[in-house]
């Protein structure tokens, strides 16, 4: 194996692998970043309220029994219902982020496997080619040796 050609190609593959890993794992880093000082977090903790939009609605304060439409009654849901909806939304957002991270991990694993297979197939192919060339060279030397022996026998007669 020609080490002078193999080491630069291996170094190039490792640089490519590091670059692909950096690009594909960027989403994982973004998912773990905390919110900045100036911007509030978009995900609220379960049980927290966002201010004036959440207020307790008593049994006599609204709903379809007072002639309000379905849309108006949805705006005046009980506090427990609104908190449950907020919790479901936050869990949904968290699952979406985890799905994105998992998708990127699967893609990066697939890319890593392809790179390793390319490296291994290149090494195996190089060794097979080298042994085949060595066998061909050995066979050519044997043929040349046989031809010179036959040529010597033909000259004697």
Swiss-Prot record:
Q: Which UniProt keywords apply?
A: Membrane, Signal, Transmembrane, Transmembrane helix, Vacuole
Topology relative to the lipid bilayer, per the entry, is: Single-pass type I membrane protein
Give me the stretches of Polar residues compositional bias.
39-52
- Primary localization class, coarse: membrane
| The keyword Thylakoid appears for this protein | no
Top-level taxonomic group = Eukaryota
Question: What span is annotated as the signal peptide, if there is one?
Answer: 1-25
The record's Gene Ontology cellular component field reads: membrane; symbiont-containing vacuole membrane; vacuole
Q: How is it used?
A: Antibodies against Pfs16 partially reduce parasite transmission during the mosquito vector stage resulting in a significant reduction in the number of oocysts.
Comp. bias (Basic and acidic residues): 132-148
* Residue ranges that the UniProt entry lists as topological domain Extracellular: 26-105
Topological domains (Cytoplasmic): residue ranges? 127-157
The compartments listed are:
Parasitophorous vacuole membrane; Vacuole
Q: What parts of the sequence cross the membrane?
A: 106-126
Region Disordered: what ranges? 30-74, 130-157
The protein's job, in short, is:
Involved in male gametogenesis. Required for exflagellation of male gametocytes. May play a role in parasite transmission in the mosquito. Binds to the mosquito vector midgut.
Protein name in UniProt: Parasitophorous vacuole membrane protein S16
Q: Which organism is it from?
A: Plasmodium falciparum (isolate NF54)
Whichever gene encodes this chain, its name is Pfs16
